[in-house]
Amino acid sequence: MKIFGLFLITALAEIIGCYLPYLWLREGKSVWLLVPAALSLAIFAWLLSLHPAAAGRVYAAYGGVYIFMAILWLWAVDGIRPTTWDLVGSGVALVGMAIIMFAPRSV
């Protein structure tokens, strides 16, 4: 569960770091949003370094959690209710993440 929580925080940092420039570029918000965006992306990169598995495995598994968090963001921030297919796809991605991260390994 600790790994999943770290993935959630990592995904949130990445989404915030990408959403703030989106607000500036697409919604005409202040250019100053780029400052917290850069900080959020730096935190995102640091958080990735805290994951205990090999980098390639972490990046592959992280993608599943990112999809889940992006769907939550769609609902919570954009105000768009996820479709059944959004939820099914997110669930499949989370199953993939669990297989990648928690499968038994000899190495």
From Swiss-Prot:
Keyword RNA-binding: no
Topology versus the membrane: Multi-pass membrane protein
GO cellular component, as recorded: plasma membrane
Keywords linked to the UniProt accession: Cell inner membrane, Cell membrane, Membrane, Transmembrane, Transmembrane helix
Residues annotated as transmembrane: 3-23, 30-50, 60-80, 84-104
Cellular location(s): Cell inner membrane
Highest taxon, organism lineage: Bacteria
Location (main, coarse): membrane
NCBIfam families linked: PRK02237.1
Similarity comment: family membership: Belongs to the UPF0060 family.
Protein's name in the database: UPF0060 membrane protein PSHAa1175
